[in-house]
């Protein structure tokens, strides 16, 4: 066993060990030194690095290590590696040398080498001095201040006996020639000097032994041992060990370079706060280096002591350098991206990195939380470097947040001032996730939007949260809103945000319902535009039919509309509702649209696009009511013409003939062709009227009435303006699908309107509700095709009714039915009636087919839809088609 240990020591030193070296080696192997937490190098790795590159020596070392391990001679796995350090501390001079030069020189070693060690007394004195050296090593290296235990006499005697036997075998090779000693002294680096140089390097300053070199490829500087020491006296293992300590200087220099580069450019508040936090971290680093420097001045510090402290310092400064490099090197990073990067480090599994990342995040996020607090309180933006952006004509990054998983259509973007003032950006450069959870982001955004809405749209400039609430917001620790905390809904700051959100929502709903009278305006739309006050449209039809046709102008039409309102039950509505009724004339001045003028803030709920839908519904009912009026006029003309012709026949028969004529003989006097025409006209007129009444009844009782009843019930229970907007929009959408109206009322323009001339391209104008195009597909191509075919057929039927009314009026304009001209006109009217029946049957079949196809169309924008309404209307139309005049065409 003893020979194996000596062989291992020779392989390490590449020479015969001296007596002192052997004794220290044996003492270490037989002692219970505590494991010093200096580094992660183990014994085997250290020994093998010393003989790296020599296959023969490597095999011999492996065999020695194997034998030692099998015999359990090594009590400590790392003991062998620390032999060199023990030898170094014995003389207070640290020799960094290659294996063939490795030696420790003591101040008295030269004298000891020249004097023969032969007497027993000298050996005992030498043993005592080594024992004292051993205690010194314990206290300095391992900080073992309580090491009062002495080596047992048995162990000491055994070691000395072993050393005596070995000394007897030694030859003159133990002694070091004076010539070799002089050469070694030249290449020796004192430990005090190397520690001083390493402290300089840790501050980024090159010294006597370490120099700062910049990598030509990456441009990154790092500390290395100067070349002359690498080639003469320092092994690669020892140089690498020291360069690890000196790398603190590289990390410090890297942080300093990044901070200097950033301060020379324009930077946002987040980047500035991060730089301030990094400066604080570097100041603490410099203070710790100063303490090391003062400790080195007061008492000599060993390299091992410096290593124990430097490893901890290196962890912290390297973490600062990594975070600074990731956040500051790329100048294109936005503030949210920087915060998300730091947030990732704050969630790191390593405690040190987690602590540093969290402290930097708290400091760097201060401007962001100030921005959030100002947005919540004032409803205005301090800057645009974060996720909330003003909506402009160039906004293409509007993020739609789903507010309720059960109501899919809540995520539908609606052209409303509530949505079009501000938006959450969907740009990857501005996203707050994972810094903030989507729930917290939505709450904060909606609170500020409510504040802005109350101040600007509601013209309530003085509106403000109570001072107690404002004080709570300003004093709240918004760092608790970070997604690592806010997952707990009961957390104090999250509960505060939820309470403020509820307060702002109730304030908006109250001012919409009470001050701006939402329900009154919805009733006005219901009774006037949607025709639920059944006598308004007939009254308007009567007034317009009594006046001559021609071009229609806004002022004259307004007078007629006001006259119609005053002559029906609509006049009972409040004056502020009647004052909103308006008229819109198309460019041809032949058609008009009764409309309803909505002002802010109600335009956020009843949007211009939805008003357009109401105008369309009024136009459909106007066509049907006009057609119904024409059908009533046809029966009046028929009855009037019949009475006039009967009177003419009786007059021609004379006073006496009146008593001779009876019904049968009277009908025989009337031409058969005229009788057949009147009979067919009456039949098709009745069936057409049945169709018109079925459509009017369907619109009023199946489409409008149930949806508005549901709407009013939902609005009463609504707690947020988003709920009000949603419920009204769902009512409009449902009516559109029930009435087969395929107008994408969110698309108010093919393209955003150009900016005003006075505004520059760099400052896009603020949008209103009609300026944004919503790319959402409300109706599929199949749906649009079906709905368009249905209304095209409806328009054609109404147009044919008007032509039929004209044909009947021309025929019944004749004074006598016994003239040749009347006979010719009767034939023309009969031919037109045949064409009308064919057209009526065709369009009726088209409408029935459309209703049948509607039962299979998908409706993705509504949570639920009852397709039975289509079946009910189809049954009504089929009843019209079963008449004898239309049955054959229907079968075809």
From Swiss-Prot:
GO terms for MF: gamma-tubulin binding
What GO terms in the biological process aspect are recorded for it? cytoplasmic microtubule organization; meiotic cell cycle; microtubule nucleation; mitotic cell cycle; mitotic cytokinetic process; motile cilium assembly; spindle assembly
The similarity annotation says: Belongs to the TUBGCP family.
Q: Which organism is it from?
A: Giardia intestinalis (strain ATCC 50803 / WB clone C6) (Giardia lamblia)
Cite the record's note on assembly: Component of the gamma-tubulin small complex (gamma-TuSC) composed of tubulin gamma chain, gamma-tubulin complex protein 2 (GCP2) and gamma-tubulin complex protein 3 (GCP3). Interacts with tubulin gamma chain.
Keyword Cytoplasm in the entry? The reply is yes
Residue ranges annotated as transmembrane are: none
Q: Which GO cellular component term is one of those annotated?
A: 9+2 motile cilium
Q: What is the protein's major site of localization?
A: cytoplasm
Asked if the keyword Cytoplasm belongs to this entry, the reply reads: yes
Consequences of knocking out this gene: Knockdown of expression by morpholino results in increased number of cells arrested in cytokinesis, reduced volume of median bodies, increase in disorganized cells impertinent for cytokinesis, and reduced length of the caudal flagella. However, knockdown does not have an effect on the number of cells defective in cytokinesis or abscission.
Tell me where it resides: Cytoplasm, Cytoskeleton, Flagellum axoneme; Cytoplasm, Cytoskeleton, Flagellum basal body; Cytoplasm, Cytoskeleton
What protein does this entry describe? Gamma-tubulin small complex component GCP3
Job description of the protein:
Component of the gamma-tubulin small complex (gamma-TuSC) involved in microtubule (MT) nucleation for the formation of median bodies and in the biogenesis of flagella. Gamma-TuSC may be required for the correct positioning of EB1 within the trophozoites.
**Which keywords does UniProt give here?**
Cell projection, Cilium, Cytoplasm, Cytoskeleton, Flagellum, Microtubule
């Amino acid at each position: 066993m003893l020979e194996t240990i000596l062989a291992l020591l020779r392989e390490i030193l590449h020479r015969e060990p001296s007596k002192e070296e052997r004794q220290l080696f044996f003492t270490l192997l037989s002692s219970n030194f505590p494991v010093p937490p200096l580094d992660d190098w183990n014994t085997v790795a250290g020994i093998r690095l010393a003989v790296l590159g020599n296959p023969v020596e490597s095999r011999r070392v492996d065999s020695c290590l194997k034998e030692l391990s099998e015999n359990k001679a090594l009590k400590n796995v790392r003991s062998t590696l620390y032999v060199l350090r023990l030898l170094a501390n014995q003389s207070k001079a640290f020799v960094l040398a290659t294996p063939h030069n490795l030696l420790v020189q003591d101040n008295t070693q030269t004298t000891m080498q020249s004097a023969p060690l032969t007497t027993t007394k000298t050996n005992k004195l030498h043993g005592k001095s080594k024992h004292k050296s051993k205690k010194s090593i314990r206290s300095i290296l391992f900080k073992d201040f309580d090491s009062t235990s002495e080596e047992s006499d048995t162990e000491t005697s055994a070691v000395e006996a072993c050393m005596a036997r070995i000394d007897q075998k030694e030859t003159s090779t133990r002694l070091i020639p004076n010539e070799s000693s002089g050469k070694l002294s030249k290449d020796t680096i004192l430990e005090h000097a190397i520690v001083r140089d390493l402290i300089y390097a840790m501050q980024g300053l090159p010294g006597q032994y370490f120099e700062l070199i910049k990598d030509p490829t990456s441009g990154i500087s790092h500390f290395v041992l100067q070349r002359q020491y690498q080639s003469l006296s320092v092994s690669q293992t020892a140089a690498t060990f020291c360069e690890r300590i000196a790398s603190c200087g590289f990390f410090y220099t890297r942080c300093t370079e990044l901070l200097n580069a950033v301060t020379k450019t324009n930077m946002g508040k987040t980047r500035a706060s991060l730089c301030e936090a990094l400066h604080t971290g570097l100041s603490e680093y410099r203070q710790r280096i100063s303490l090391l420097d003062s400790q080195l001045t007061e008492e000599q510090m060993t390299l091992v002591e410096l290593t124990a402290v430097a490893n901890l310092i290196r962890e912290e400064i390297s973490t600062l350098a990594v975070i600074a490099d990731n956040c500051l090197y790329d100048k294109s990073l936005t503030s949210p991206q920087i915060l998300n990067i730091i947030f990732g480090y704050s969630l790191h599994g390593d405690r040190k990195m987690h602590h540093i990342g969290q402290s930097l995040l708290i400091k760097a996020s201060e401007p962001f939380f100030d921005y959030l607090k100002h947005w919540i309180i004032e409803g205005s933006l301090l800057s645009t470097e974060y996720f909330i952006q003003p909506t402009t004509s160039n906004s293409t990054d509007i993020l739609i947040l789903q507010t309720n998983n059960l109501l899919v259509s809540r995520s539908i973007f609606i052209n409303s001032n509530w949505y079009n003032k501000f938006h959450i950006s969907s740009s990857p450069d501005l996203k707050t996730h994972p810094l903030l959870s989507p729930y917290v982001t939505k709450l904060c955004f909606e609170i500020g939007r409510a504040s802005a809405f109350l101040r600007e749209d509601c013209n309530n400039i003085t509106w403000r949260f109570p001072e107690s609430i404002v004080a709570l917001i300003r004093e709240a620790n918004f760092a608790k809103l970070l997604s690592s905390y806010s997952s707990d809904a009961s957390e104090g700051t999250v509960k505060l945000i939820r309470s403020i959100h509820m307060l702002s929502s109730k304030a908006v709903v109250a001012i919409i319902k009470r001050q701006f009278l939402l329900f009154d305006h919805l009733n006005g739309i219901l009774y006037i535009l949607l025709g639920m006050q059944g006598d308004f449209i007939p009254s308007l039809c009567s007034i317009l039919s009594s006046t001559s046709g021609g071009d229609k102008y806004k002022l004259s039409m307004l007078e007629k509309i006001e006259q119609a309102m005053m002559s029906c039950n609509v006049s009972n509505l409040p004056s502020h509702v009647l004052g909103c009724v308006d008229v819109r004339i198309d460019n041809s001045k032949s058609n008009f649209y009764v409309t309803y003028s909505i002002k802010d803030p109600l335009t956020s709920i009843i949007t211009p696009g939805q008003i357009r839908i109401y105008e369309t519904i009024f136009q459909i009912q106007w066509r049907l009511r006009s057609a119904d009026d024409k059908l009533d006029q046809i029966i009046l003309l028929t009855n009037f013409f019949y009475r006039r012709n009967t009177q003419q026949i009786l007059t021609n028969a004379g006073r006496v003939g009146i008593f001779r004529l009876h019904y049968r003989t009277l009908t025989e006097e009337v031409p058969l062709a005229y009788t057949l025409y009147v009979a067919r006209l009456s039949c098709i007129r009745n069936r057409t009227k049945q169709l018109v009444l079925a459509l009017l009844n369907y619109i009023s009782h199946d489409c409008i009435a149930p949806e508005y009843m549901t709407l009013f019930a939902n609005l009463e229970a609504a707690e947020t303006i988003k709920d009000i907007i949603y419920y009204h929009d769902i009512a409009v959408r449902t009516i559109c699908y029930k009435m087969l109206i395929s107008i994408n009322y969110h698309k108010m323009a093919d393209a955003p309107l150009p900016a005003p001339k006075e505004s520059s391209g760099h400052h896009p104008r603020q949008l209103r509700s009609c300026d944004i195009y919503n790319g959402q597909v409300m109706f599929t191509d199949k749906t649009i095709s079906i709905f368009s075919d249905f209304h095209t057929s409806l328009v054609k039927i109404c147009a044919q009714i008007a032509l039929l009314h004209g044909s009947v009026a021309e025929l019944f304009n004749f004074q006598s039915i016994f003239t040749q001209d009347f006979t010719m006109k009767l034939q023309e009217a009969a031919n037109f009636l045949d064409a009308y029946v064919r057209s009526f049957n065709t369009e009726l079949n088209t409408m029935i087919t459309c209703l049948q196809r509607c039962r299979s169309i998908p409706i993705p924008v509504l949570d639920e839809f009852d397709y039975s309404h289509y079946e009910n209307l189809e049954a009504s139309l089929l009843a019209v088609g079963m008449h004898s005049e239309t049955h054959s065409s229907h079968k075809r």
